């Protein structure tokens, strides 16, 4: 008997959801055969070239990833693709596009002027800043509409402010109420300047759920 592998094996096994490691553009050399986890994000709204047959061609990156998502969605199990998203930090703050756009606006800072590092990765994206919050929501909508992503797993979700998460949830459910949203319910590996009551962590999510279910 022929043993199916890869895509065919997942379909035969009845898998109805596949969570990918971060696939948006990371700070890596796309022409070197080295492994990268993808947790050093550089450009949040474009597919990383390492997954493309032609990294230099943006259209190829887009079309090939769309084909991947569609192939899973159209198989016997209607398998949904879930993206691991890393909006809590960037690969670098000082050399990022955000820093070039408006210096220090998009990153949390300490009273002494240094960068907050609750992520343990050198910086924290200031999700509570109005334009940063708007960027995250629109980025998620971008992936959900243009690539038909059906789920999002948030890395260090506790470092994303709860108001931004609420806006993101509403925006995604407006597109498709069946979209799956989940994440790591803690803040990271160090002190953060984001107030505790504003973190999308396990404690706050439980409290909000309890309040929603408690009358009066």
Q: Whereabouts are the PLM-identified features?
A:
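Surface-exposed intrinsically disordered loops and tails
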Residues: 1-2, 54-57, 192-200
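Aromatic- and acidic-residue-enriched carbohydrate-binding clefts of CAZyme catalytic domains
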Residues: 28-74, 91-134, 138-146
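Catalytic domains of carbohydrate-active enzymes, especially glycoside hydrolases
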Residues: 3-32
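Active-site-proximal helices and loops of the catalytic beta/alpha 8
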Residues: 22-32, 38-40, 45-48, 71-75, ...
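Generic structural signal for well-ordered alpha-helices
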Residues: 7, 65-69, 83, 140, ...
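Conserved Walker B
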Residues: 85-90, 157
């Amino acid at each position: 008997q022929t043993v199916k592998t890869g895509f065919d094996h997942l379909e035969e096994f009845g898998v109805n959801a596949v969570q990918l490691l971060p696939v948006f553009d990371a700070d890596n050399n796309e022409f070197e055969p080295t492994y990268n986890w993808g947790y050093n994000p550089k450009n949040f709204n474009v597919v990383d070239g390492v997954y493309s047959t032609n990294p230099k061609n943006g259209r190829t990156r887009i079309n090939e990833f769309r084909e991947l998502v569609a192939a899973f969605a159209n198989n016997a199990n209607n398998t949904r693709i879930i993206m691991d998203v890393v909006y809590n930090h960037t690969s670098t703050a000082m050399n990022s596009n955000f820093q070039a756009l408006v210096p220090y606006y998009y990153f949390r800072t300490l009273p002494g002027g240094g960068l907050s590092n609750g992520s343990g990765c050198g910086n924290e994206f200031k999700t509570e800043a109005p334009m940063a919050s708007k960027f995250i929501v629109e980025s998620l909508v971008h992936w959900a509409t243009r690539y038909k992503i059906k789920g999002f797993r948030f890395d260090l979700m506790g470092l994303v402010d709860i108001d931004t998460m609420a806006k993101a949830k509403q925006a995604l459910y407006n597109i498709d109420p069946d979209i799956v949203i989940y994440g790591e319910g803690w803040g990271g590996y160090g002190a953060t300047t984001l107030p505790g009551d504003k973190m999308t962590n396990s404690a706050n999510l439980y409290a909000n759920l309890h309040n929603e279910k408690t009358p009066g």
